[in-house]
Amino acid sequence: HRLRQPASFESGGEKGGLFKSIDGGITWKKITNGLAKGSSGMIDISIHLNNPDIMVMAYEADENLPEDEPGTGVYISYDSGESWKFLLKHAVRPFYHGQIEIDPINPNNIYVVSRGFMISNDGGKTFGPRRWRTDGGDDHDMWIAPYDNKIMYIATDQGSRLSIDGGSTWLSHNNMAIG
C-alpha cells in the first residue's frame, strides 16, 4: 500500500492503472498490454487531434521494477490505447511534473513537460532536451494551438511563456505563479 502522511506522499497503488471505456463510461477495461507490471501512479495522456489512434502517455510505474523492464516514462500507442510501446525512461513525478503533449499537426513531435523537459521530433525514436530556454524554473503545462503548431504556451514557476515560432523565441509573462 502507499504511504500518505503530512510529511510524505507516495502516489499510485496496486489498484491503479490505465482504464478505457468505449461506451461513455458505463463499462471500463483495464489496459495492460505493453505497460509496466505492478502498481502505477500518475498518468497523463495526449491524443493526436487528427488521428485518435495515436496516443502518447507519461506513466508513473512501480519504482522497484528491475532496471531492464519498462517502467516510469513515455509510452506510445497506435491503436487507440489498446497496446503500448515503451519509448523513454523519464521521471514522472506525482505532483505537477509529467505532462505530455503530442503536436496536433505533426504526430512525430512529442513534448514531455517536466523539470527535465524532453522533445522528440521523430515519433519517439529519440528524445533530447528542449531547444529553448524559458528562464522560468520548472515547466508545468503546455498548450499547442490546434490550427498552428508554431503557437505554443508553457506554464512555469514564474508565469507563462508564449512562442509564435515553434519555440525559437519566447515572450515571458512573469506576473503570475503557476504550479
Task: Tell what function each PLM region has.
Residues H1-G179:
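Beta-propeller blade termini and top-face loops
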